[in-house]
Amino acid sequence: MKLKELESCLQQVDGFEEPKILLEQYPTSPHIAGCMLYTIHNTFDDIQNKLVADLGCGCGVLSIGAAVLDAGLCVGFDIDEDALDIFRGNVEEFELPNIDVVQCDVCSIGSSYAKKFDTVIMNPPFGTKHNQGIDMQFLQTAISMATSAVYSLHKTSTRDHIQKKANDWKVKMEVIAELRYDLPASYKFHKKKSVDIQVDFIRFTPT
C-alpha cells in the first residue's frame, strides 16, 4: 500500500468529539499516523503478521492503520470509555477482524502484559500541564510490553532526557524522523488556530 493510500484511508477515521484536557487528548493527524505506520511497516517490517499494541489509542487511528497493514492482531489500550466508543465505531466501519480494545489505565498494565507484544506503537500524552512525567510512564510500560520494538512520538525538547532514561533502562534509542506536529486549537485556552510543535519519531529496541 502506498503512503498516500494509507493516509487517505486514515482520513476516514472519526476523531474525538470532545477532547478531554486532563487526558491530553490531541488527535494524531492522518498524515503523521500514515508516516509513522508506513515507516514501521516498510523500513522495519514490524507490523505485518505481528502482535501490535497501541497505548493511549484514543479513537484508534494508529490501531486501524496497523490493522489495515495486516497486523496479526492490534490491541488498543485507553482509559477513556468515550474515546473507545468512537474507536469501536471506527472498527465496525472499516470491518477489521484483526483489532481489539482494552479499557484500562495504561500506566498500570505493564506487568500484566510483559513481553506479550512484538511491537508497541503510541502517541503518548506529552506530559505537559497536569500530567508531568506521564510520557515516561507510557514509555516504560511500552518497553516492558514489547519484544521487538517500541515506536513513539516525543517532543524534541525532551530528547536528551529520554536518551538518559533509555540508557538507564538499557534500551537502544534511534530518532527516525523529526516531525512538525500541528496541534489544532482543540481547547478553549488555545489562543492560536494551531500550534506547531517539533516532535521526534523514535524507535526503541532492547539492547
Swiss-Prot record:
GO terms for cellular component: cell projection; nucleus; postsynapse; presynapse. Keywords: Cell projection, Methyltransferase, Nucleus, S-adenosyl-L-methionine, Synapse, Transferase. It is found in: Nucleus; Presynapse; Postsynapse. S-adenosyl-L-methionine binds at Q25, T28, G56, C59, V61, D78, D105, V106. One of its GO terms (biological process) is stem cell differentiation. InterPro entries: DNA_methylase_N6_adenine_CS, rRNA_MeTrfase/Polyamine_Synth, SAM-dependent_MTases_sf, Small_mtfrase_dom. rRNA N6-adenosine-methyltransferase activity is inhibited by zinc. It comes from the Eukaryota. The keyword Transferase applies. Disruption phenotype: Microcephaly and curved tails. Its main location: nucleus. GO terms for molecular function: nucleic acid binding; rRNA (adenine-N6-)-methyltransferase activity; S-adenosyl-L-methionine binding. Pfam families: MTS (PF05175). SUPFAM superfamilies: S-adenosyl-L-methionine-dependent methyltransferases. It catalyses: adenosine(1832) in 18S rRNA + S-adenosyl-L-methionine = N(6)-methyladenosine(1832) in 18S rRNA + S-adenosyl-L-homocysteine + H(+). Its EC number is 2.1.1.-. The keyword Methyltransferase applies. PANTHER family: RRNA N6-ADENOSINE-METHYLTRANSFERASE METTL5 (PTHR23290:SF0). Catalytic subunit of a heterodimer with TRMT112, which specifically methylates the 6th position of adenine in position 1832 of 18S rRNA. N6-methylation of adenine(1832) in 18S rRNA resides in the decoding center of 18S rRNA and is required for translation and embryonic stem cells (ESCs) pluripotency and differentiation. Belongs to the methyltransferase superfamily. PrmA family. This is rRNA N(6)-adenosine-methyltransferase METTL5. The gene is mettl5.
